[in-house]
């Protein structure tokens, strides 16, 4: 459903009974509208939102699995669907007008593709985020290869392999959302966005700055009981995530690290970490072994891919999964069979998935032709989001500042608060990073931990 209100253009996904799951028909309707609005001088801002409990709970994977059972012809239809979806996601990632995603409710899979690459991603107390693909014999697609490895520390790898959910303000602390608002504020924000006026010669950057300030006006504070230090994105659990999923670790090394935390032989791990490690190890071992191994390699390689390369290579991987039995098995077990069944993965364990098996998912020349907003074949390329400044400071930015400038905690916090224009959550985020990653001398000067 498409709405017009002064300079605001709204895309509303309105299949609440199916949690607004994305299908080919919806994608085919959205793409030409985005192209039309990009050329319209009357369209200033685009908002995407969902009716009911979800922005979008994912693609209609049940329909794809049933299609795949038909054999090569059905599998080709599924491959064509992913080509269409990734073209839409790339268009959003390179859109020439301000684009805002209301992540107000369940935002998973295909819904992540509609929001993750937007310059503005608004979480609320109702937000539930996840990349659940390894649980259905698939991989974290829709540009996950780009976003996840660029998250702070090893959060992206953890979320990809486990399908773990983040809820509410934790979606904001993690950097997945750029802003956190109470859901009751969203209609008023929409009205305000419709009233915004820009000069014809205003650059995209200038327009984004105005919208950023406008959204901040509606921020009423973050929950006092969900400081980043007592959530999974900070504190002891975050230290454990970065340790267990550290760069260049193989899946066997990750499982070994989790086992070590579970056994706690040095008596150094708090009970919350011990419980988390045991649960996380069990979760990974229950996922599709093929999906887990492919996803880990995907994230390691995706850290160097540009945004266009990401979607083209993901289409190769997705096409291979449409031919693999685990996708049909996982979707059937979780979403089609009544009651749900336990999936029988093939191969059934991680040690049975060979390097050659994984290589096959990355083999072949990418052929996906991406579109720009004029409908022409064009690949917008960047290796980091040009609009990354709209969110909270990233860990590497905070640590880089401290490394370059001998400063105190107070000075570092003041710098980032001022640099962000007083953005909500900056103080808490910077403090949590520095308490976890730096030591203070008697004079208060910070030194990064080794």
Q: Where do the language-model regions lie?
A:
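Contiguous mid-protein beta-loop-alpha structural module that forms a pocket-lining wall or clamp
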Residues: 154-200
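An acidic, glycine-rich surface segment that forms the CoA-thioester-binding/catalytic face
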Residues: 31, 62-103, 144-146, 359-362, ...
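Hydrophobic, secondary-structure "cap" segments at the distal end of domains
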Residues: 146-154
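A structural preference for short, pocket-lining loop segments at secondary-structure junctions
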Residues: 6, 11, 29-72, 91-102, ...
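Glycine-rich beta-to-alpha active-site loop
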Residues: 92-136, 158-168, 179
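Amphipathic alpha-helical blocks and their helix-capping loop/short-beta junctions
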Residues: 182-287, 291
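Conserved CoA-thioester-binding segment of acyl-CoA-metabolizing enzymes
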Residues: 1-49, 364, 384-386, 393-450
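Hydrophobic/aromatic residues within transmembrane alpha-helices
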Residues: 48, 60, 114-115, 170-171, ...
């Amino acid at each position: 459903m498409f709405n017009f209100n002064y300079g605001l253009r709204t895309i509303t996904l309105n299949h609440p009974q199916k949690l607004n799951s994305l299908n080919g028909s919806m994608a085919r309707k959205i793409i030409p509208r985005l192209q039309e609005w990009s050329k319209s001088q009357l369209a200033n801002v685009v908002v995407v939102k969902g009716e009911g409990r979800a922005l979008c709970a994912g693609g209609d994977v049940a329909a794809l699995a049933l299609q795949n059972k038909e054999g090569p012809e059905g599998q080709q239809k599924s491959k064509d669907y992913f080509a269409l979806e990734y073209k839409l996601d790339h268009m959003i990632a390179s859109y020439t007008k301000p684009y805002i995603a209301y992540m107000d409710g369940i935002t998973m899979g295909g819904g992540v593709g509609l929001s993750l690459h937007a310059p503005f991603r608004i979480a609320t107390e109702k937000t539930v985020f996840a990349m659940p693909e390894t649980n259905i014999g698939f991989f974290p697609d829709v540009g996950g290869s780009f976003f996840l490895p660029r998250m702070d520390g090893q959060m992206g790898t953890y979320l990809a392999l486990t399908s773990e959910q983040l809820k509410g303000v934790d979606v904001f602390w993690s950097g997945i959302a750029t802003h956190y608002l109470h859901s009751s504020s969203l209609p008023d924000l929409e009205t305000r966005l419709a009233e915004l006026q820009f000069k014809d010669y205003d650059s995209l950057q200038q327009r984004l700055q105005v919208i950023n300030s406008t959204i901040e006006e509606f921020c009423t504070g973050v929950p006092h009981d969900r400081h980043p230090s007592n959530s999974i994105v900070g504190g002891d659990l975050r230290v454990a995530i970065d340790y267990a999923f550290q760069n260049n670790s193989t899946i066997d090394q990750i499982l070994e690290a989790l086992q070590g935390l579970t056994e706690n032989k040095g008596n150094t791990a708090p009970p919350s970490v011990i419980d988390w490690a045991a649960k996380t190890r069990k979760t990974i071992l229950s996922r599709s072994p093929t999906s887990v191994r492919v996803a880990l390699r995907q994230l390691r390689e995706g850290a160097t891919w540009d945004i266009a390369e990401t979607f083209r290579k993901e289409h190769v991987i997705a096409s291979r999964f449409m031919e693999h039995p685990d996708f049909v098995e996982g979707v059937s077990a979780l979403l089609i069979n009544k009651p749900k069944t336990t999936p029988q993965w093939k191969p059934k364990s991680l040690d049975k998935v060979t390097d050659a098996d994984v290589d096959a998912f990355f083999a072949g020349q990418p052929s996906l032709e991406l579109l720009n907003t004029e409908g022409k074949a064009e690949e917008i390329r960047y290796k980091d989001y040009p609009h990354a400044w709209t969110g909270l400071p990233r860990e590497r930015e905070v640590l880089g500042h401290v490394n370059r400038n001998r400063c105190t905690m107070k000075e570092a916090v003041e710098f980032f608060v001022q640099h962000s224009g007083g953005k909500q959550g900056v103080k808490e985020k910077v403090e949590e990073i520095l308490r976890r990653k730096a030591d203070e001398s008697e004079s208060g000067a910070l030194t990064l931990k080794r």
